């Protein structure tokens, strides 16, 4: 870690908070994650066929290791380039980091669910939530739509904001790009479907490992956000529920931020859900909380989320400030 990395991170968090992922920009340019997806798709098409489970698993291991190595190499090259460019390189690096963060874009997508419910009722909420979750929206009633939006916000706070920021802080651009490649691979091939059970095994397991520290850190950031927006009791509940109920989730990591958000808002989250016609039967997280979530709870979740993001930026700034004053 270096002080410059934290300074870049603070600037990147501010840029992402203010600008996000504007449609006008990415309609004209290709987002880097799209290139990651295309690279993963090439390996998937070439190697994920015509072999037994053991060979497919080995091919999947080779695939993700090659992709991670390529990402790290790209990060090293960009580091060298930005170092040579001096102040311009600093700005370009901050913009690059901001591209891989998801504060404003995530909040905007989640807010659209509340807006959809208020303007077009259940169908409006279902349409908006279908853009951010994989579950079947037709199976969701209004509280289910609200829970799905809040769960997505909490989970993606961990792997869309905290994890990329953490891996950048630990290993610079190589760490950030490797994490984003791994996370993209997990979303594309890390499923337990027959097609990817073996080929995507390594990507899924490595993604679980890479997200482990961020998921735990996100609990304290959500608790801090709850403290600033909802008081001490909400912050305490966020930590208590996360410690108690995180294991109710099928994911080893997603349960931490989702349980923290459930405690912060005093609502129930997770529970039985339908994905592709298959019901995932899990207990409710924070079962003692309110059973009926509303659009107002989505607004409250976004407020806590933004305070948590502010806490992350402030913590990074605190690490930098003493050196700037020397």
Curated annotation (Swiss-Prot):
It comes from the Bacteria. The chain crosses the membrane at residues 58-78, 81-101, 157-177, 304-324. The keyword Transmembrane helix applies. Pathway: Cofactor biosynthesis; adenosylcobalamin biosynthesis. GO terms for molecular function: ABC-type vitamin B12 transporter activity; threonine-phosphate decarboxylase activity. One of its GO terms (biological process) is cobalamin biosynthetic process. Coiled coil: none annotated. One of its GO terms (cellular component) is plasma membrane. Keywords: Cell membrane, Cobalamin biosynthesis, Membrane, Transmembrane, Transmembrane helix. Its main location: membrane. It is a multi-pass membrane protein. Pfam families: CobD_Cbib. It is found in: Cell membrane. NCBIfam families: cobal_cbiB. Converts cobyric acid to cobinamide by the addition of aminopropanol on the F carboxylic group. Belongs to the CobD/CbiB family. This is Cobalamin biosynthesis protein CobD. It comes from Sinorhizobium fredii (strain NBRC 101917 / NGR234).
């Amino acid at each position: 870690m270096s002080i410059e990395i934290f300074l870049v991170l603070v600037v990147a968090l501010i840029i992402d908070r203010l600008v996000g992922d504007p449609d006008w920009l990415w309609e004209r340019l290709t987002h880097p994650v799209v290139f990651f997806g295309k690279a993963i798709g090439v390996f998937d098409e070439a190697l994920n066929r015509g072999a037994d489970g053991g060979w497919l698993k080995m091919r999947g291991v080779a695939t993700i290791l090659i992709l991670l190595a390529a990402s790290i190499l790209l990060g090293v090259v960009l580091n060298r380039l930005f170092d040579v460019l001096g102040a311009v390189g600093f700005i370009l690096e901050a913009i690059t980091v901001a591209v891989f963060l998801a504060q404003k874009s995530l909040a905007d997508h989640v807010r659209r669910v509340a807006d959809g419910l208020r303007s077009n009722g259940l169908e409006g909420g279902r349409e908006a939530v279908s853009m951010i979750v994989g579950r079947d929206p037709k199976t969701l009633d209004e509280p289910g739509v609200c829970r799905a939006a809040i769960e997505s916000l909490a989970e993606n706070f961990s792997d869309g904001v905290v994890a990329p920021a953490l891996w950048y802080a630990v290993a610079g651009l190589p760490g950030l790009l490797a994490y984003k490649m791994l996370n993209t691979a997990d979303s594309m091939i890390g499923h337990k479907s027959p097609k990817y059970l073996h080929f995507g095994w390594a990507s899924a397991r490595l993604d679980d490992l890479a997200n482990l520290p961020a998921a735990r850190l996100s609990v304290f950031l959500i608790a801090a956000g709850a403290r600033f927006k909802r008081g001490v009791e909400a912050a305490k509940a966020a930590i208590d529920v996360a410690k108690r109920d995180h294991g109710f989730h099928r994911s080893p990591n997603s349960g931490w931020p989702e349980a923290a958000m459930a405690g912060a808002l005093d609502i129930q989250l997770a529970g039985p859900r339908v994905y592709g016609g298959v019901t995932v039967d899990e207990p409710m997280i924070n079962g003692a909380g309110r059973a009926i979530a509303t659009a107002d709870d989505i607004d409250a979740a976004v407020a806590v989320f933004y305070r948590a993001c502010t806490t992350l930026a402030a913590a990074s700034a605190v690490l930098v400030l003493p050196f700037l004053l020397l």
